[in-house]
Every structure is written in structure tokens, then in C-alpha cells.
Design a protein with these regions (language model features):
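N-terminal secretory signal peptides
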Residues: 1, 12-14
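N-terminal pro-sequences and low-complexity stem/linker regions of secreted or lumenal proteins
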Residues: 6, 11-12, 21-267
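N-terminal signal peptide c-region/cleavage motif recognized by signal peptidases
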Residues: 16-18
Length: 267
């Protein structure tokens, strides 16, 4: 999608047909989330970008992935179920993107490939054939859209290719990429301005899977998130999915119904 079409869709997204659920945010106004690859909590918690998340946000110290390999974990994050063990299934299942698109006004989902191309198995919206409003490439594109091309309420999925998300490349490179994302969000009025009810956009960051017990680093970050908090409440990818649907005031998806929402960053 070119920039003109992208901005046209974003402008149109504030309107929707009648008869659908009202769009409401409970804890945040918009959601940005991204995922790194294949490292356990203790392997990465000391990285500079992760220490920044710990200082300025809320770390979920007992957060776990739900499966192996990558694909099922990504699907669990956005749809509340793994839908099998295959890396990709390329089949429609309800996801946070499809239910958000059904609200009034609709809340659109955008996918940003910040470095290279997100692998298909790491792009659950593509895998689940979700309704995505726009696909953009490069951190500069995100920075430009944050300056005026995004609706006030949106879901942004940000990702990197396997050389830049710690799958194949060094931790230092991935760390720099996450730091660049944090700097970009912190410098944008879109991410740092509350809505009429005082809610800010929020960033959720985690790893898809780890070693053995699958405990991974996960954190929430943003102006509305409690700073310097470490939660010891157990959570999983299903809990993230449950948190998104609860924030929208919608029923939970699939197995996420059996998980509680992540509330510690706001309570």
C-alpha cells in the first residue's frame, strides 16, 4: 500500500457502519507491540533496551510462552490459540485485528516491517489472514506516520527480519533496534498524547519462546504505564490476548478465556 492509500484508509477508519460494538479503551488508547526471538528471560534482561523498559515501564517477571516452535506462539498472542504446531497455517481465525475492525468506529491494525521483512511465521496477522489496514516498511515510515498518518486509536504490530530480531543476528543488533523503536515512540506526539479520557498508547514487548520452561522477558511501556514495577504474577501469551480483548470491552478469544488479563501496569 502506498502512502497516499495508507493515509486515506487511516482517515476513513474513524467511521464505521452502525450496529457494531462501540470502540472503547480500558487501559490504553492504542497498542503497539513487537516480539523478539528465541531467548529466555535471564539471557536478555541485562540488555540496555530491556533495562530501560524496566526503569520506565512494568516488567512481567513470570511471563511464559505457550508452545514451540515460533508460529504457534505468535498465533496465541493475537488469537488466543495456537491452532496446531505448524509454523504457518495460512487460515482465517478470529484475531485481535478482526474483532477490532468490527468496532464502531473500527480500530485498524497496521503492520510495520522495521528492518527487512518479517518472516511469515513471525507475522501472525498474515498467517491468520487478518484484516490489516496497511503494511509499511522501515523505521522512517513509522516515524512519518506517527507524525500525522495514524488514527487516534489503532493497533500497530512492529517486527524485524531474522537478522535483526535475535533469531539469527547478535543480541547487540536487536538491542539497538528496540532502543531505536523506543526513541521513535517517545519522540512522537501520537504516542505521548492522551485521549479525551486520559488514556495513552502503550507498548507491549516480549519474546516468542525461550528455553526449557519457556520463561521469557515481557514488558509494558508508555506514559500511562507504572514505572519501575516488576510483576510476579504468572502470565502467558494467552494473557496478553485476554488483556487486549478486555481493553476493548469484548469477549476473550479461544483459550485466552482461561487466562486473566494483565492489569499490574495500570493498577
Amino acid at each position: 500500500m502506498d502512502r497516499r492509500a495508507f493515509l486515506g484508509w487511516a482517515a476513513a477508519a474513524v467511521f464505521g457502519p452502525p450496529g457494531r460494538a462501540e470502540a472503547r479503551g480500558r487501559w490504553w488508547s492504542s497498542l503497539v507491540f513487537g516480539v523478539f526471538e528465541n531467548h529466555g528471560f535471564d539471557e536478555v534482561a541485562g540488555l540496555p533496551s530491556h533495562r530501560r523498559l524496566a526503569r520506565e515501564g512494568t516488567v512481567l517477571a513470570r511471563y511464559s510462552a505457550v508452545a514451540h516452535p515460533s508460529g504457534p506462539n505468535y498465533r496465541a498472542l493475537v488469537s488466543g490459540a495456537t491452532w496446531g504446531t505448524a509454523q504457518t497455517i495460512e487460515t482465517f481465525h478470529p484475531s485481535i485485528a478482526s474483532i477490532a475492525a468490527g468496532l464502531v468506529p473500527p480500530i485498524p491494525t497496521f503492520v510495520y516491517h522495521l528492518e527487512g521483512e518479517i518472516a511469515r511465521r513471525h507475522n501472525p496477522f498474515l498467517d491468520l489472514r487478518a484484516p490489516v489496514a496497511g503494511v509499511r516498511h522501515g523505521l522512517a515510515a513509522l516515524r512519518s506516520d506517527l507524525a500525522g498518518g495514524l488514527p487516534p486509536a489503532a493497533v500497530l504490530y512492529v517486527g524485524w527480519d531474522d537478522l535483526n530480531n535475535m533469531h539469527d543476528g547478535p543480541p547487540a543488533r536487536a538491542d539497538q533496534n528496540l532502543s531505536a523503536l523506543l526513541d521513535t515512540l517517545a519522540a512522537s506526539a501520537w504516542f505521548t498524547t492522551p485521549d479525551r479520557e486520559g488514556r495513552y498508547p502503550a507498548l507491549f514487548f516480549c519474546y516468542d519462546e525461550g528455553r526449557l520452561a519457556n520463561r521469557v522477558f515481557a514488558a509494558w511501556w508508555g506514559r500511562g504505564v507504572r514505572r519501575g514495577r516488576v510483576s510476579q504474577v504468572p502470565h502467558t501469551h494467552y494473557g496478553f490476548c485476554r488483556t487486549v480483548t478486555d481493553n476493548l470491552g469484548l469477549p476473550p478469544l479461544a483459550r485466552a478465556a482461561g487466562s486473566g488479563p494483565i492489569t499490574e501496569p495500570w493498577t
